Amino acid sequence: MQGQTKSVSFDGREIKLTTGRFAPQAGGSVMIECGDTSVLVTATKSSGREGVDFLPLMCDYEERLYAAGRIPGSFMRREGRPPERATLISRLIDRPMRPLFPGWMRDDIQIVATCLSLDERVPADVLAVTGASMATLMAGIPFQGPMAAVRVGLLGDDFVLNPSYREIERGDLDLVVAGTPDGVVMVEAGANQLSEQDVIEAIDFGYEAITELINAQKEVLKESGIKQEMPKAPEIDDTISTYLDKNCTKSISEVLKNFDQTKEERDNKIEEIKISISAKIDGLKDDNAVKKSLSLNNKLLENSYKALTKKLMREQIIKEGKRVDGRELNEVRAIEADAAVLPNRVHGSALFQRGLTQVLSTATLGTPSDAQEMDDLNPNTDKTYIHHYNFPPYSVGETRPMRTPGRREVGHGALAERALIPVLPAKDTFPYVLRVVSEVLSSNGSTSMASVCGSTLALMDAGVPLKAPVGGAAMGLIKEGKEVRILTDIQGIEDFLGDMDFKVAGTEKGITALQMDMKITGLPIETIGEAINQALPARTHILGKMLDAIETPKDNLSPHAPRLLSFRIDPELIGTVIGPGGRTIKGITERTNTKIDIEDGGIVTIASHDGAAAEEAQRIIEGLTRKVHEGEIFPGSITRIIPIGAFVEILPGKEGMIHISQLSEARVEKVEDVVKVGDQVTVRVREIDNRGRINLTLRGVSQNGGMSNYPEPTPTPVAPLT
């Protein structure tokens, strides 16, 4: 089981591609390794199913926690449903692979990438994408590869190729670019308000590095003896398409050029034309070639009609520069935006509408304990900003069962989340956990970018002090030969019939998120740069409309949002606050009706709907962690009495004891002869013993009326609380 291994020196690291050793019954397999990260990728094809008119491609990324030396935290101690991270990486593999299969393919194809070992210096996702290409080539599946992917980071002014998790966290850019010899096929990025030029240069930097990985795949394929052949597309009976072209072109074109109609009216008219031509074909004689052709393939009419509509729409854009709704190529649809559309039981809300796309976003403020714990291979285990995206069937006028969120919902939520993270306030100034939910109420393209806009408004309505508002738009592309047209703010039909969906989100200062998907085999950097630059004025326009709804974040939180106080204590004193078995902290929470979270670094966060209660809890904790020194004088209250002395609370939650011999200069027979529970006294710290116990005295301390004949001592200064 030696297999064949090809090593590539890549930016000072070695990437190994091993084929022929693992998963021998898979169609094709490769173990791709870099450092201690190992990903096994397999590609398998089975014969197509009858009646399928699309490519049934399945891409699955699987994580095994043993890859990081961990045991799953579930009851069964076994990996269960794929975590969100695995779903996102599955999409990351699918998006650059799908456009590289021939459009006529209908066979079932499954690509499975399994992370078997993880090195925190080498993320597995880009290795899985490159491995998917190699495995597909080894399987002999018709495929317009090779394709490879790299990650680009930005530390200071320098681009970093395939940065580690730590470098990604420290840097201002996390960009993944995938490409073929023909150009870039996929881009995904999160950025800290970077300029358009910086992002374009980063994509170019990454694409240049891809060449080495593409060449390595070619060499492995050559040495394996597997020939990469692209079979000819099956011959398609053009009888129907010719008939439709002759009988429907004029009527469809008239509908597409009627800019005064609504989307519903346009869709209905196009459907009416199809029904009419179908009835006309039914009336033909049985020996007619058109009718014969249709009898052999009942989906031929549907597919040919869609193809004709697509061709006519694209020709209208290329030749006339007009879109189906009459907009110019760089024009944004009409925008409406409103904040505070729900009662303040919801901490923040907003409604954002662009054309027929409408999204309701809500923001909820939570406490640190509401952070999402991620049981996956990502070393960053907690999420304090969570964005969920819901796409119900009624948003497109359809009916279907309501199920758990699919990959699309997870992916769109993650993109909107990524777009807003760079503008969220620092944790030490605004310690809330934030959850935003975007409900798509109506969809006609670019719902993810509408979610970004609506979520910004909802967070501002909730009083979250964002560094800057974030807006976004989806850019489209029509490419016919050398003719290229870039579209701003694409709607549904342009997404469906076009060649690109390029989402760009950011602030006035710069870009915060990108996601580009292609339906063609690659685009040059120049065209991508043109699309990014064309998105800037659109984003500026959108942000202006958003600020008309709410100009700045609200000064006050919803009265139904928790109030948080955050401060720092000495980490060594965390145990003092928690107490034996958690008794101390439990007592504080019960006494003040608050919720208290303490991080390992000593950051204490107190949550309460009553600000005074939160301040009381803070006072108690600061008292517990306040260092007491010998000689200091404190007012206090007698809390309990024992035969040998009395206990005094000198600070919130902190007690010391007055021994019976320290109650008076004279001999005392019973403690109750001098003090009782509830008495207010002034005490001096006599000593702190080696067990940290505080011993107090009344001797020599004035009691505002003279419990002692000694002169009043000079007060000892108390260090300010920090």
From Swiss-Prot:
Gene Ontology cellular component list: cytosol
Natural source organism: Prochlorococcus marinus (strain NATL1A)
Pfam annotation, one family: RNase_PH_C
Keyword GTP-binding: no
Cofactors demanded by this protein: Mg(2+)
Family: Belongs to the polyribonucleotide nucleotidyltransferase family.
Chain segments carrying region Disordered: 700-722
Compartment annotation: Cytoplasm
InterPro entries reported for this sequence: ExoRNase_PH_dom1, ExoRNase_PH_dom2, ExoRNase_PH_dom2_sf, KH_dom, KH_dom_type_1, KH_dom_type_1_sf, NA-bd_OB-fold, PNPase
Top-tier EC class: transferase
Protein name as it appears in the record: Polyribonucleotide nucleotidyltransferase
Catalytic activity: RNA(n+1) + phosphate = RNA(n) + a ribonucleoside 5'-diphosphate
Main location: cytoplasm
Protein function: Involved in mRNA degradation. Catalyzes the phosphorolysis of single-stranded polyribonucleotides processively in the 3'- to 5'-direction.
Superkingdom in the source lineage: Bacteria
EC number: 2.7.7.8
MF (Gene Ontology): 3'-5'-RNA exonuclease activity; magnesium ion binding; polyribonucleotide nucleotidyltransferase activity; RNA binding
UniProt keyword annotations, A-Z: Cytoplasm, Magnesium, Metal-binding, Nucleotidyltransferase, RNA-binding, Transferase
NCBIfam families: polynuc_phos (TIGR03591), PRK11824.1 (NF008805)
Pro residues composition bias: residue spans: 712-722
